[in-house]
Amino acid sequence: MAKKSESKKTKPKSAGLMTEVAVENLAFTLGRKADIDEVLRQAGLTRQRLSVLMVDDEIAQAMETRLDAVLNAPWRFIEDHGEQTVFLKELFTRWHAEIVSGAWEACPYGYSVMEANYALTSDSKFTLNEIVVKPLEWFEPKNDGRLIYRQNATEVDVNAKYPLKFFLTRRKPTFKQPYGDPLLSKLYWLWFFR
């Protein structure tokens, strides 16, 4: 009697769905570049989740102190172009705290996006009506300077479609890291193991 050949049951090889390559490929397929910040990658965090560090009293106090220093720094316009300079000085004086605070958000998170809403004055001039910081997860900075809005399966180049509507501020961006360098990612492991 012939011996039955035993078929060796083996598991199929994994396609590596949990590897960085798979995650990067999925992100590329979806159109969003994977964040290459090493700390965020190792911790499994998104940039928005760095906000948990702001709950720490020491970190929050240090960030607030630095923001206050920036807000209280003197500013001036170098060139004088007459009526336009006067108009811009009035505008910047009115919106100084909102503009500087919104741009400063790039320090802890690497980048920030502000949306400006305009109004028409009685003497037919466009002026700022509102300027607000928008959520990081809605936008993707590109290494060529473009800003992409991603929401509800849509992708819009906001600089092309809405010029002077959205303002991107980045901290130390590079070609490889267009999202900028977030300060809070450097504190993450120190905070986590405290």
Regions found by a protein language model. Give the residues of each.
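Binding/recognition "hotspot" determinant
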Residues: 50-53, 58, 62, 66-69
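Structured, contiguous alpha/beta core segments that scaffold functional sites
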Residues: 2, 13-17, 21, 25-31, ...
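N-terminal acidic, proline/glycine-rich, low-complexity intrinsically disordered segments
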Residues: 1-9
